[in-house]
């Protein structure tokens, strides 16, 4: 499908998500894999939210932030994966302009929110391990609520400016988006107008969000590691590290895939690579989080055991 003249995003007309072209057997395999992973993501994160709500021992700031992260993962994957699954069906990749813009806004807003939430969770672990006697007085329920709310507000505000700029772009020629959801980079490639401002603003916001959240996380864990090393007993060190190991694992996976995603030569020559790596952030990481927090967290495992036994 092609258009011979440039059209503004407000002009009616669909885009087509290319998804994952290839042999039918491969597409069926990917469809089933993504479907199973999506269902596991929803069920796993709902289970964590339910566990925290059902057990008073888990109703602390740490698990309040975890519930926010679990809710975010459900929303994040739901904003992306159902349409991705639709691209495997004939004409399933067709998406309206409004639908594409809406999906892009929510996917990237939720992505920014995750960076902020992970930074807040790192700060919470810093207080719990480095300042245990003052933790209860500092990390009050009110502060935890404000930090979580601030993460959501900052995440959804950060993408507003680039989304507005993208909405003003004109497109000509092909409207086939070489991705499995409405990403910014493929839209920039399709535009027939100057995209320098959009690229600069998008890069600036991504740089500030990633660098800011990463900075808070790194500083927090620098203090945490220093404090753990100073603990004289091996048992004490293990106990202290176990309180943050789950979060650290999630942070390493999330930032690791982010680094791979942004280390690339050019937008045009790396769309296929970007599409493959983005699967880590949008599909793989959300399904891993519930299992990481369940398998590596003693309190969550105990709450799950009590729930299964009906106690």
Curated annotation (Swiss-Prot):
PROSITE patterns found in the cross-reference section: G_PROTEIN_RECEP_F1_1 (PS00237), G_PROTEIN_RECEP_F1_2 (PS50262)
Domain of life of the source: Eukaryota
Subcellular location, record wording: Cell membrane
GO terms for cellular component: plasma membrane
Annotated Pfam families: 7tm_4
Membrane topology: Multi-pass membrane protein
Residue ranges, Cytoplasmic side: 54-60, 124-142, 223-239, 296-311
Name of the protein: Olfactory receptor 287
Source organism (scientific name): Rattus norvegicus (Rat)
């Amino acid at each position: 499908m092609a258009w011979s003249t440039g059209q503004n995003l407000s002009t009616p007309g669909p885009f087509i998500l290319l998804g994952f072209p290839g042999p039918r057997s491969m597409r069926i395999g990917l469809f089933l894999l993504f479907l199973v992973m999506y269902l596991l993501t929803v069920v796993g994160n709902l289970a964590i939210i339910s566990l925290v709500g059902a057990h008073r021992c888990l109703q602390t700031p740490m698990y309040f932030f975890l519930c926010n992260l679990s809710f975010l993962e459900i929303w994040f994957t739901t904003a992306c994966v159902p349409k991705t699954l639709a691209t495997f069906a004939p004409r399933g990749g067709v998406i309206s302009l409004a639908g594409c813009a809406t999906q892009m806004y929510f996917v990237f807003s939720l992505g920014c929110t995750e960076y902020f939430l992970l930074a807040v969770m790192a700060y919470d672990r810093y207080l719990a391990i480095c300042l245990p006697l003052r933790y209860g007085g500092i990390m009050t329920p009110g502060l935890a609520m404000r930090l979580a709310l601030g993460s959501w507000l900052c995440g959804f505000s950060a993408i507003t400016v680039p989304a507005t700029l993208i909405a003003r772009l004109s497109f000509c020629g092909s409207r086939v988006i070489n991705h499995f959801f409405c990403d910014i980079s493929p839209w920039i490639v399709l535009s027939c107008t100057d995209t320098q401002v959009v690229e600069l603003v998008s890069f600036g916001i991504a740089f500030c969000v990633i660098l800011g959240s990463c900075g808070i996380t790194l500083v927090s864990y620098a203090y945490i590691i220093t404090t753990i090393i100073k603990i004289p007993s091996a048992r004490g060190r293990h106990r202290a590290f176990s309180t943050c190991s789950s979060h650290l694992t999630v942070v390493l996976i999330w930032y690791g895939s982010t680094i791979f995603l942004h280390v690339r030569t050019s937008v045009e020559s790396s769309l296929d690579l970007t599409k493959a790596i983005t699967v880590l952030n949008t599909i793989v990481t959300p399904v891993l989080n519930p299992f990481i927090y369940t398998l590596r967290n003693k309190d969550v495992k105990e709450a799950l055991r009590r729930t299964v036994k009906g106690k």
